[in-house]
Amino acid sequence: MPFLELDTNLPANRVPAGLEKRLCAAAASILGKPADRVNVTVRPGLAMALSGSTEPCAQLSISSIGVVGTAEDNRSHSAHFFEFLTKELALGQDRFPTVLSTSPAAHGGPRCPGEIIEGKKSCLNEEALFIYFI
């Protein structure tokens, strides 16, 4: 279940209407997950500085169990999100980092009481954080 958080210093009136739905669909396609399992939050109008500058920028944080993988996969995911969001938000190429982090299965709660989370070896203590500038 991927969680995407898009933070931007763009005012709300510069964020295209329906972006959260389009980002959800794009994330499902890029990450290979069903859209009904993707969660998106868009936060416009934030006080942000990127590389010391307050020029328009955005940051996408993606966390998921089993989606964030190899460096090659993460570069590919980042490139696809970069392409999608720079067009949607009309941002410069140097104004949009993507942060990918794996969420250990132990960090996710069961969907209903008593449910056991299936899967192979738990990735406890194997959390990874990747930041890419494409």
Curated annotation (Swiss-Prot):
- Domain of life, per UniProt, equals Eukaryota
Q: Name one GO molecular function term.
A: phenylpyruvate tautomerase activity
Record has Lyase as a keyword = yes
| E.C. number(s) listed in UniProt | 4.1.1.-
Location relative to the cell: Cytoplasm
UniProt GO cellular component terms: cytoplasm; extracellular exosome; extracellular space
Keywords attached to this Swiss-Prot or TrEMBL record, sorted alphabetically, are: Cytoplasm, Lyase
Check the record and name the Pfam families matching this protein: MIF
Task: Please describe what this protein does.
Answer: May have lyase activity.
The Swiss-Prot or TrEMBL record describes its family as follows:
Belongs to the MIF family.
PANTHER family in the cross-refs: D-DOPACHROME DECARBOXYLASE, D-DOPACHROME DECARBOXYLASE-LIKE PROTEIN
Name-wise, this protein is D-dopachrome decarboxylase-like protein
Tell me what organism the protein belongs to: Homo sapiens
Higher taxonomy: Eukaryota, Metazoa, Chordata, Craniata, Vertebrata
